[in-house]
Amino acid sequence: MFDIGFSELLLFGVIALIVLGPEKLPQAARTAGQWYAKIRRTVSTLQSEIEAELDLAETRQQMQKELAKIRQTEAEMRREMAEMRGSMQEFESSKNQHLKASRDLVDDAKPRQSSQGSSENDDNRPVSPKSFDYAYDNNRQAEKPESSEQPSAQGDNDSLKTDFNDNANPVIQTITTRPWENMWFRLGAYDKARRLPQPPYLPNYKADILLNSHIDSLLPKQASVNEQESH
């Protein structure tokens, strides 16, 4: 600790022996040793405390650095979240605008279609099928010579023609939903185990010979008992 060698200690001992004498030298050496031990313990304690303080300072610096990194990452995450919220709001606004524009177009197209359909119904009359026209023409050719005798029959045919033309107009119905009748679904392993009951256990007498040997031993006894009862 004090960088003292063996020669210095020997010289110090000789001087102490000359000054103190042989009677007081052991007590002085003991006292010097105690003081030396106390000083060494004090120095080691101070050194350990200084090292602990240095370690504590280093740990504080590291903790401050880590806290700064955490705060930086938190600020970056908040900025990214704000950007994501802004992009989501822009997407929602654009989506709402698109839906509004499509609804406006549909609302504008509905009165046009209704006006066009009404004008077409007023201008165009329904056309009867060719088979009906052919049958009607044949009937009319056959009834030409008898037109003076049967005017009421022609009136009935005209009424039938108008009724058929009225019924010939197709009626379009939009099917929005589909019924769930006659539709089958394939069950998976999980649904089978959950919904279907467990199959009954059927013992295999050929494979489980040792387990079912007592049944084979009971059969002859039961047969002998039955024979005795019959006799």
Swiss-Prot record:
Pfam families: TatA_B_E. It is found in: Cell inner membrane. Its main location: membrane. One of its GO terms (biological process) is protein transport by the Tat complex. Residues 148-157 have a biased composition (Polar residues). GO terms for cellular component: TAT protein transport complex. Residues 101-111 have a biased composition (Basic and acidic residues). The chain crosses the membrane at residues 1-21. It is a single-pass membrane protein. GO terms for molecular function: protein transmembrane transporter activity. PANTHER family: SEC-INDEPENDENT PROTEIN TRANSLOCASE PROTEIN TATA, CHLOROPLASTIC. Belongs to the TatB family. This is Sec-independent protein translocase protein TatB.
